[in-house]
Each structure stands twice: as structure tokens, then as C-alpha cells.
């Protein structure tokens, strides 16, 4: 117990908070590069991969968030949570995709750009922990959407959701400014708390991050297991076909998002304490990228409402009109439009969420 308290006590001196108060210089006791000879390895292929995937995901994610923020979807507490999740996901994607790709491309280590890597690592680690808390909150929200008898449902109703969102917001701020950052090393194309790989020291262990990752794995599995049970029960007893279809979409979206988060959390905890071959470390880095990218991929592939609005946002009006004129017109189109409208109304009335 005393060991854990010691590791947590030196978080402040190893954190972004100290870095900013010390004239944007990391603590010399923990992050002194004087006399350190640690050369990186240029990773041009992986560097280009991470940067290209990051740009692609951001080009999809940002329009999705714009659509969500401007649409009636924001009437749902679920989408208010998703909007905040999207904002911190973008911060993480900048770090684990664009910055990771660039640093890997040039073969950088912590001592190559200590100030820049320290700052980026603080943002990346803090926003990752914040996204974990937000995902758990989202899972609880979805459970209460389906089972209205859960007492916690009241914290998502009306203006209460704004106070509830302060929980992941404060947790994100704490994680960014008051815990140890992750630091890049091109030898493994990943981020570690220890800036000097090969010089082992337990003073770089981030206890808060470890607890966070263990909790997100256990809580996510438990909550989504419960969600699966609720959906299975609803499918057997619900009279509305539209409700059944909506619940299935919720389950698919939740599982896809949860799986990447839990995988990244588990691998990162494991490789901080046990030997991991480079392939496993790289898998963890890709899983971290996928954990934040999966949300917008789910939006654009499974959520017809968001997909339709994104097309409307990105495709010029004259192109849409030209496509509408040249497309084949059949009598089934008004019927399908009516069905979509009815499905939307049914979904709002039953779960408060359009999927």
C-alpha cells in the first residue's frame, strides 16, 4: 500500500501541471536527457500508415460531430455524451495517429523532442482515460434507456445530464494535468511511461492509468453483458418491430466500440508490467487508435440518420439535385420515406435515441 501511495505522490512532479509551472520543462529528476544516448529507428511505412489512417478517420469523425451538434439528435442525453466523447476522441487521434506517425517516420525518442513529446503524451494519456470514463457513462445511459426502472436514469433526464457530464470532464482534466504522461519511442512505435527503455525503474508507473484500464475492462464487460441481456429480453417480449431493430443496432454499436476500448486497455496495462514482444506492443498501439476511430466508423456505417446528414453536409446541393434527377424514381420511395419517419418517431418515443 505504501508503494502505491509513493507512486501516486510523485505523479504531481511528473505531470503536465509541474511541466507548465516549471517553464515548460519536465522534472529533471525523472526526465533528464543529459548524457543519455538513446537512438530511435526510422519507421517510414508505419509512420505513413498511422498518419494516413488518422487523417482518414478525422475527415469522417469531424463531420459526424458537426452533424450531431446541429441536429435534433442532441435532444437525447445519449448524443450529448457521444458529442463529448467525440471531442476527446479527436484529441487522442491527433496524438496516437498524426503525432505517432510523424515521430515514427523520423525515428524520434523522448530525448529528441522532450518538451513536445511530454506535452503530447499528457494530452494523449489524459484524454484516453477521459474517454474510458465517458464510455462507461455511455454504457450506463444505454442501460437506463432500455430499463427505465434503474434509479440512475434520473441523472440523464433534462438538465441533469449537464451536471452528470461534469464527472468525465473533471476526470479528464485530472488525468491530463495531474498524472504521468506517456512518452513516445520509435524503437517500438508506441508510447510508454518510462522515457528510457532499457533503464528499468518503477518510479514511472502510473497507478491511476492502471486502475483506469482495469476498471474499464471489467465495467465495460459487465455493463455490456447486462445490456445484451436486456436486449435479448426485449426482443422476446417487445411488441414493436421498430423497437427490436433499434435495440439490435444499439447492441452492435456498443459491442464494436467496447471491444476496441477493452482490448487497448488490457494490452497497455500488460505491456507496462510484463515483457511484451514488439508485435504485441504494436498491436496495442493499433488497438488504441482503433478504440477512438471505431466510434465514427460505427456512426457512418450503422447510423443512417448521421450518414444521411453527413452526405448533406459534404455534398454540394447542386450535386445532390443532379443525382436525384438522374436516379430512378419508383413508387416505393415515398413509402420508404414514410417508414423512415415512422421508425424515427417510434424510436424517439421508446428509447429517446435514434440509431
Residue ranges and their predicted role:
Residues 1-355:
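Seven-transmembrane-like multi-pass membrane architecture, highlighting hydrophobic TM helices
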Amino acid at each position: 500500500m505504501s508503494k502505491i501511495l509513493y507512486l501516486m505522490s510523485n505523479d504531481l512532479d511528473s505531470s503536465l501541471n509541474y511541466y507548465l509551472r516549471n517553464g515548460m520543462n519536465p522534472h529533471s529528476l525523472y526526465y533528464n536527457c543529459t548524457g543519455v544516448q538513446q537512438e530511435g529507428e526510422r519507421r517510414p511505412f508505419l509512420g505513413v500508415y498511422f498518419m494516413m489512417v488518422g487523417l482518414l478517420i478525422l475527415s469522417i469523425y469531424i463531420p459526424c460531430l458537426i452533424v450531431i451538434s446541429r441536429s435534433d439528435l442532441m435532444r437525447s442525453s445519449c448524443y450529448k455524451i457521444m458529442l463529448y466523447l467525440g471531442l476527446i476522441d479527436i484529441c487522442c487521434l491527433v496524438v496516437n495517429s498524426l503525432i505517432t506517425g510523424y515521430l515514427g517516420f523520423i525515428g524520434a525518442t523522448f530525448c529528441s523532442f522532450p518538451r513536445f513529446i511530454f506535452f503530447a503524451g499528457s494530452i494523449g494519456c489524459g484524454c484516453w482515460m477521459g474517454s474510458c470514463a465517458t464510455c462507461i457513462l455511455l454504457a450506463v445511459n444505454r442501460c437506463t434507456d432500455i430499463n427505465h426502472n434503474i434509479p440512475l436514469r434520473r441523472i440523464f433526464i433534462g438538465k441533469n445530464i449537464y451536471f452528470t457530464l461534469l464527472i468525465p470532464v473533471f476526470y479528464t482534466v485530472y488525468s491530463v494535468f495531474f498524472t504521468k504522461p506517456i512518452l513516445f519511442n520509435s524503437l517500438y512505435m508506441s508510447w510508454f511511461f518510462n522515457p528510457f527503455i532499457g533503464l528499468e525503474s518503477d518510479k514511472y508507473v502510473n497507478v491511476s492509468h492502471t486502475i483506469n484500464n482495469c476498471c474499464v475492462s471489467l465495467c465495460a464487460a459487465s455493463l455490456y453483458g447486462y445490456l445484451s441481456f436486456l436486449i435479448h429480453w426485449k426482443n422476446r417480449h417487445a411488441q414493436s418491430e421498430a423497437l427490436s431493430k433499434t435495440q439490435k443496432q444499439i447492441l452492435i454499436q456498443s459491442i464494436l466500440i467496447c471491444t476496441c476500448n477493452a482490448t487497448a486497455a488490457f494490452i497497455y496495462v500488460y505491456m507496462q508490467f510484463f515483457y511484451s514482444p514488439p508485435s504485441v506492443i504494436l498491436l496495442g498501439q493499433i488497438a488504441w487508435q482503433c478504440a477512438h476511430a471505431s466510434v465514427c466508423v460505427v456512426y457512418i456505417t450503422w447510423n443512417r440518420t448521421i450518414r444521411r446528414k453527413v452526405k448533406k453536409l459534404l455534398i454540394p446541393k447542386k450535386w445532390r439535385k443532379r443525382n436525384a434527377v438522374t436516379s430512378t424514381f419508383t413508387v416505393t420511395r415515398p413509402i420508404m420515406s414514410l417508414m423512415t419517419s415512422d421508425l424515427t418517431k417510434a424510436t424517439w418515443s421508446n428509447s429517446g435515441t435514434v440509431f
